[in-house]
């Protein structure tokens, strides 16, 4: 009688241990979404926000600040974001093997090659553009690469949420290009930057839906 009473408890304990092990394995294979999204969100929110305040539509200056400050801040924060998200992804990929490891590595190289290709094009075109359109080229082009890579990531890992994020970033970027220099910075700051922060928070609260 005593053994029969203990059996359900043993089964429940086994299920609990299995679930804990599954959760631990999932956490080890999945990078912290906050480290993947928040750094980029902060970089865009702050960096493009400063660009809008200093280089507004039609050359308007909303806040007088040194010319070098907005771009320097944006580039610095984007470098930090690239390093932080790259390290987070690399740590997670160490536990992968086979096809999953190869997919992650190829996806990482796609980021590098995508930006390299865009930079090569932008460097060639920049001397032929005015300052405001040159700024739009670099801003819209870099955001375009990011949006495309998130779309690809959503397709590769069959993540609807990740694909929707890429779609949103792409749509916001297109809208910014249509309205033109100055306004593009504001739209990216609030639309894309805030979206990245919200997405990182959502992915952290709802693990397992993004990767």
Predicted regions and their residues:
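N-terminal juxtamembrane cytosolic/stromal segments of multi-pass membrane proteins
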Residues: 1-33
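Helical transmembrane-bundle signal
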Residues: 44-51, 78-85, 115-119, 143-150, ...
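Residues within membrane-spanning alpha-helices of integral membrane proteins
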Residues: 34-37, 41, 75, 112, ...
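Juxtamembrane membrane-water interface segments of multi-pass membrane proteins
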Residues: 23-27, 86-98, 163, 203-211
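Helix-coil boundary and interhelical linker segments in multi-pass alpha-helical membrane proteins
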Residues: 52-65, 123-135, 179-183
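Selected alpha-helical membrane-embedding segments in polytopic membrane proteins
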Residues: 30-120
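Membrane-proximal helix-loop-helix units in multi-pass membrane proteins
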Residues: 99, 103, 107-162
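Terminal transmembrane helical module of multi-pass membrane proteins
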Residues: 146-211
